[in-house]
Structures are given as C-alpha cells and as structure tokens.
C-alpha cells in the first residue's frame, strides 16, 4: 500500500496504526492464521514488522470459530509503503485456517 500521499504526516511521527482481524480455525485441528504488517522506506528497506494471531485450537477450546485479534503500533517516520500479509499454517489434512474482516487503519495521534 503506497503511503507517499501522506508522507508529510508520517514524517512528523504522529501516525499510528490499528491492525484487526477475526482469526480462527476448525475444531481441534491446530490449523491457524496470522496477519503480518510490514512498513518499508522508499528504497524497500524494512523499517518495522508486527502482527496479530495466530489463534490455536486451544485458544478456541478445540471448537470451530473465529476470534477478534488486535494490534496497535507507531508508523515509522520514513515509511513509504506498507504490506499486509495473511499466513495460513496447516497442521494436518486440509488447511482450515480462517480470517475475516482484516483491517489496517492509520490514525493521527
């Protein structure tokens, strides 16, 4: 995601982010999903990475479901781009890692 349109605000160092998603899986299977956020400068150098999840089977009481996970942080002042990645991990059988309503919001402080 291109952030160069708000580079002045980011440069002032008063922009934070909120990353949210409903994450989960199937039954007692330990298939799981995580969401990563990575901020890069204009040369493609990684400035900051963070993320939310995963939600393991034990976190779901070995039932099928999705649960809200949230993360907040500061956007590095020289950020030009941000990438959001969903990683699904398979424990066995089919991959039943779930994600819904993934959201990244940038906020002024």
Residue spans for each PLM region:
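Extracellular carbohydrate recognition and processing domains
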Residues: 44-81, 92
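Beta-strand acidic-aromatic groove motif in beta-rich domains, primarily in extracellular
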Residues: 19, 28-40
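Single-stranded nucleic acid-binding surfaces, predominantly the OB-fold ssDNA-binding core
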Residues: 25, 37, 46-50, 100
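Extracellular carbohydrate recognition
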Residues: 29-31, 64-65, 76, 88-108
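Short, surface-exposed loop/turn segments at beta-strand-coil junctions that are enriched for proline
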Residues: 2-9, 26-27, 73-78, 89-92
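Solvent-exposed strand-loop boundary residues in beta-sheet-rich modules
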Residues: 27, 41-45, 108
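Extracellular beta-strand-rich recognition modules
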Residues: 17-23, 68-71, 80-89, 102
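Extracellular/lumenal carbohydrate-interaction signature centered on repeated Trp-anchored short motifs
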Residues: 1-19, 62-63
